[in-house]
Amino acid sequence: MKILITGVHGFVGSNLVKALSEEHTIYGLDIVSPVKDGVRYTFSWDYLDKEDGIPEVDAIIHLAGKAHDTKNKTVSDVYFKVNTGLTQKIYDYFLTSKTAKKFIFFSTAKAAADKVDGILTEDVVPSPVGPYGESKIAAEKYIQEHLVDDKQVYILRPCMIHGPGNKGNLNLLYGVVKKGIPWPLGAFENRRTFTSIENLNFVIEGLLTKDVPTGIYNMGDDEALSTNELIEEICKSLGKKAHIWKLPKGLMTGIAKIGGALHLPLDSERLRKLTENYISSNAKIKKALGVEKMPVDARTGLEATLKSFK
């Protein structure tokens, strides 16, 4: 199978190339186009407008996008220009392709909901908060408004993706624990769904090779983990004893309010993000792929990621 991957030089793109390149021919589409092992050739975006600019492919995986800026420094228009605009451009190209029959769009769980009561399923009425989620849901809507019968389209809503070499939020938390700083939020009981890169690769391979119905699919590991469990796993990987303090919730909430006024590292929003529940169901994608469980459990995937931080 010939596959075009946008954002091929990013973390997820690089891992998909490793997972798919032995059995498939991979082409890239990115803002930079250096030589990359496993990729036949990487094109720049202007090649979409050229006649015979990009070879005909069988499937397109659209990863390119503006990631969520947790510091809120990105102008909202940038999110819509990239996350919505580029999606429209590559999807229009897909619709005109004579050979491409499968399109996989990486949206985000945040397009569905910023907060989750209970378990998040694909049936939820989307209520994104902020330009990141809003730009992703706008891209989803455009795709859904332009579906065609002879092509299969998959909109994926993954929870936080991690894996070896990923320098994201887990790496930041790892750095805090490595310094020996006690975790003061042990009194908060929460559970969150994560997406191990091995499970992501498994899902993509299945969507490419199996006859899966067009639709929206949540993506995540089978097991949800608490922040306290994350701290324990990080300490385990470092060979350290976990120092988890169960300080009163009211005290920590008050400190967070003061922190917001004084621009300290812990404010009310960050406290919410660190202690809220965000559980997403992956039952629909497993049923579509004909499997009962993901190949890698959440803890095993986390261990592999943490090991790479050393």
Language model regions located:
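Amphipathic terminal alpha-helices
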Residues: 284, 292-310
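Substrate-positioning beta->alpha
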Residues: 166-172, 186-208, 214-215
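Conserved Rossmann-fold NAD(P)-dependent oxidoreductase catalytic core, especially the SDR/UDP-sugar
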Residues: 89-131, 154
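NAD(P)H-binding glycine-rich loop region in Rossmannoid oxidoreductase-like domains
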Residues: 44-85, 89, 93, 111
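Active-site Tyr-X1-5-Lys
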Residues: 127-154
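N-terminal Rossmann NAD(P)H-binding glycine-rich loop of SDR-like oxidoreductase domains
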Residues: 3-23
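Conserved C-terminal active-site "lid" loop/helix of NAD(P)H-dependent oxidoreductases
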Residues: 197, 232, 255-292
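Mid/C-terminal beta-alpha module of Rossmann-like enzyme folds, strongest
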Residues: 210-266, 302-306, 310
